[in-house]
UniProtKB/Swiss-Prot annotation:
An aminoacyl-tRNA editing enzyme that deacylates mischarged D-aminoacyl-tRNAs. Also deacylates mischarged glycyl-tRNA(Ala), protecting cells against glycine mischarging by AlaRS. Acts via tRNA-based rather than protein-based catalysis; rejects L-amino acids rather than detecting D-amino acids in the active site. By recycling D-aminoacyl-tRNA to D-amino acids and free tRNA molecules, this enzyme counteracts the toxicity associated with the formation of D-aminoacyl-tRNA entities in vivo and helps enforce protein L-homochirality. GO terms for molecular function: D-tyrosyl-tRNA(Tyr) deacylase activity; Gly-tRNA(Ala) deacylase activity; Ser(Gly)-tRNA(Ala) hydrolase activity; tRNA binding. One of its GO terms (biological process) is D-amino acid catabolic process. Homodimer. It catalyses: glycyl-tRNA(Ala) + H2O = tRNA(Ala) + glycine + H(+); a D-aminoacyl-tRNA + H2O = a tRNA + a D-alpha-amino acid + H(+). It holds the Pfam family Tyr_Deacylase. Its main location: cytoplasm. PANTHER family: D-AMINOACYL-TRNA DEACYLASE 1 (PTHR10472:SF5), D-TYROSYL-TRNA TYR DEACYLASE (PTHR10472). This is D-aminoacyl-tRNA deacylase. Belongs to the DTD family. A Gly-cisPro motif from one monomer fits into the active site of the other monomer to allow specific chiral rejection of L-amino acids.
Length: 147
C-alpha cells in the first residue's frame, strides 16, 4: 500500500457536486493499493495511522495520535499513487492493483480503521473533488513495503 497522510483542520470529498464524506480535525488519507498487498500490509498501515503521533500536544510538540485528539479520517482511494513516470510523459498505472482486488482491500482497510476512529470516505473509482485545509502543513508518505 502507498498512502499519503495529511493532517487537516477539515476536509471533504464531493462527487457531482454532492458531499460524499467530510471531517473536521483529523487526517485526510490518499490510499493506493498494490497488486501484492496482503493482510500484513493492511495491519501495518492501520496500526501506524491510528498510533502515529503527528498532532500537537499542549506544548506544541507532535506528541498525540488521532485517537488522542478524538479526530476523524477521510479516506480517498487513489490508484495514481502507483504512477510509473520512467518512460515518456504519460504516467503508467500498471503497478496498481486491479480494481476488483483494490476495491475489496480498500473496504477492509476502512473497516479496520473504523474500529479505532470515525472514518468518512469517498467512492472507490469515482471522479472526486477533494477539499481540505491543511494543518501545519503536515504530510506523511507511508509505503507498507518499506518497513
Amino acid at each position: 500500500m502507498k498512502l499519503v497522510l495529511q493532517r487537516v483542520k477539515e476536509a471533504s470529498v464531493s462527487i457531482d457536486g454532492k458531499i460524499a464524506g467530510a471531517i473536521n480535525q483529523g487526517l485526510l488519507l490518499l490510499v493506493g493499493v498494490g497488486p501484492d498487498d496482503a493482510a500484513e500490509d493492511l495491519a501495518y498501515a492501520v496500526r501506524k495511522i491510528v498510533n502515529m503521533r503527528i498532532f500537537s500536544d499542549a506544548d506544541g510538540k507532535m506528541n498525540q495520535s488521532i485517537q488522542d485528539i478524538k479526530g476523524s479520517i477521510l479516506s480517498v482511494s487513489q490508484f495514481t499513487l502507483y504512477a510509473d513516470t520512467k518512460k515518456g510523459n504519460r504516467p503508467a498505472f500498471t503497478g496498481a492493483a486491479k480494481p476488483d482486488m483494490a476495491s475489496q482491500f480498500y473496504d477492509r482497510f476502512n473497516e479496520q480503521l473504523a474500529d479505532f476512529v470515525p472514518v468518512e470516505r469517498g467512492v472507490f473509482g469515482a471522479d472526486m473533488q477533494v477539499s481540505l485545509i491543511n494543518d501545519g502543513p503536515v504530510t506523511i508518505i507511508l509505503d507498507t513495503k518499506c518497513h
